[in-house]
Amino acid sequence: MLVALGLSMVVAAVPTVASASIPLGTVVSANPANFTPNVASGAVYKFTQVGGTMYAGGAFSSVSTPAGVSPGGTFARSNIVAFNASTGVVSSFVPSVNGEVWALASDGTSLWIGATFTSVNVVARRGLAKLNPATGAVDTAFNANLASGKVTELALVGGRLIAGGTFPGKLRAVNPSTGANTGYLNLSISGSVTTNAGPVEVYRFAV
């Protein structure tokens, strides 16, 4: 189900796949990058890049580096990992996240993560937290105070952090510094998709 909103936004109530033709100068290799970290067990749901560092969020407890990358080995990482986008070297960014990471957003100086977690670095935060992208420390000034549910999509738009998910209201625009609900989005999102699909949620959106 797709719903168009007044913010020039399209909301997907169920997972969808989007594709577009991109002209390429050469044929893409079947193995375009063999230096990035490997997730042996679990899944990666989202990537975002801040400068020369790539962040990957998902459901995993460790990553390993392929042969030729130094320092190599297996690194314990709780559902989020950061690595050098050019070399694949895993960084010392090690926040402790107690749930799957579904969404990432950054303005270049901060990193927001959306997920199923209830705490980050033992700081109580449900579904949405703001981190220092260099150290992984939680910005305690930011608290969205979500009562329940998870965050599956994030986007910084017009000075607001837009979050979508299963939390009450399903779609919310919060202050990127404090996490307070700005009230910019006041929508009623409800209903069902199919008999057995469960309640409607905002899974992905495009702005």
Predicted regions mapped to residue ranges:
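Extracytoplasmic surface signature
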Residues: 1-4, 8-207
